[in-house]
Amino acid sequence: MNYSLPRSLSLALVLLLGLAGCAKKDATPSPSVPPTTTVTPPVDPHLTYLKLLADGTTNQALPLQKAIDSCSAAGGGTLVLRKGTYMIGPIYMKSSVTLRLDTLATLLASPNMPDFTVNGKVVNLINGPGGAIHDVTLTGAGTIDGNGAPWWAAFQANSALVRPRLIYITSCQNLTVSGLTLTNSPSFHLVPSQCQNVVISKLKIIAPSNSPNTDGIDPANCNQVSITNCTIDTGDDCIAIKSGRVNGALVDACQNLTVTGCTFLHGHGLSIGSETSSGVKNLTVSNCTFTGTTNGIRIKSEPGLGGLIQNVNYSNISMTGVTNPLVINMAYALNPNNSYPADIPSVSGMTIDHLTVTGAKNAGSLVGLTTLPIQNLTLSNLTISAQTGLVMQNATGVVMSNWVINVTSGKSIITQNVQGTGF
């Protein structure tokens, strides 16, 4: 069978061929234009963008929890929340799950306080599941907001009120928390408890200076913890390293920790304690700045809550406008826990090197127990400007070198029951 093209289509083909022929005969060829290549990024099968309702008022805990559970059950991956405010109640992280909050993505705690009572107990905003887990990450440039104001007000009216933490992860191997802004927790902001290999970096932790018990980062009975380049501005301890008993039993010490490159604004400084019954050892703090905090370097504990604190080292520390730059207080609450009379706090092997302090109220107060003095304390390269001097009591093996303590009233150093050299 013979086919013929319609006349209009035949004319169009002739015209196109003619134009092509003209282009070939052009004496001045057009410059060569490189072809445009469109690259389609590979699809990451482990990356899931969640489509939750971002109206800031509808509780999204259930769909978020389902996504976490499914992701972990499938072998793990990354769940991403894009720009928006996602209101949630308590959620539980699972193994091999990364939760990423992109810029302007906010997880906002439900304002409904009963949402945080489960089976008669107060639970936290972001929890571990209660058993051992591994490879959990919270990251991104977004915000986790604890919506703490109603809790703070309720606590002022009832100091026995138990309040949620913002993030409380227990028994996790390989925990990473990075990049986020954590703010307005009802109580502590970030608590890794009995975790192994914890990496915390580039966090901003912010709460009003008068918000009660809003600690920044509180590692408890953890091993291998790195805290780097964080800015913490809260109403209580910026960092508090703890090692209390767990269900009444002594457990592993909180050990092998580094804190470096951090900035502390307001709050109560960098503390060890007050719970130290299981011990704290091998802490290195370096290149940190304190501005306007109540305390700088602080160790606080008491009989009934105490244990051995050993091999703790601080270097290259700068403080401005800090009320109490150096504090060791082994009778912190003056309220001994008679349940564990053998849990006596002690400090052995502490060094502070290259410390610069300006505008302090007190140079410091380093006071051990009369029955168990501070042992082996080395202070070197100190430059301190304060209203009153450095008080040391109940300490042995104190070595001081290359120090300048300028005070406006009294002696630079006041000692009682102290043995050592250089002061």
Please place each PLM-identified region on the residue numbering.
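Extracellular/periplasmic carbohydrate-active domains that bind, remodel
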Residues: 22-423
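Bacterial Sec-dependent N-terminal signal peptides
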Residues: 1-33
